[in-house]
Amino acid sequence: MLFNIIKTTMAYLESMPKKDRKKIGQFFTSANTAQYMASLFKIPNKEHITILDPGTGTGILSAALVERVLKYNENIFVELTCYEVDENVLPVLQENLHHMKSVYDDRLDIILKQEDYILSQADDFNHDIFEDREAKKWDIVISNPPYMKIEKKHPASMAMSKVVHGSPNLYFLFMSMALFNLRPDGEM
């Protein structure tokens, strides 16, 4: 499965100039790194595992982790949530997620959210402690978020002003939000 996703990712990389990807902080994870990162997780001993990949890109990290979890654990069901906003990469991601679903059909549920991950979680992140609301939490977060500095007036910086000190970096904000979205016994 991962081989097919690597192929579509390589085709995308060849079609999209590096300077354009660099402008939006888009640097894709290599196949070897994705497999290595997936190997680091201790898979929870439960029947239903939730995985979050904020800023999914082409889905290579998700694919490596899902393959690791489901290939050797026949009694596990995975719910994978992917966030991606880049209109150029979305068709590639959708194709890759469709391929993943075709391989692991009844053991994998995929939720693709075409929205800004940080802004979508901002209300939960900033909620008043007296409000009765429960933020969505995941068992595992795997991510290679965009890497770039942003201004303090950027919507993501303003949404997470509690953790913005000095020059904000989108990578840091993604990781801070992912930590917020992690179950207490979860892994990042």
Label every model-predicted segment.
Residues M1-M188:
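SAM-dependent methyltransferase catalytic region
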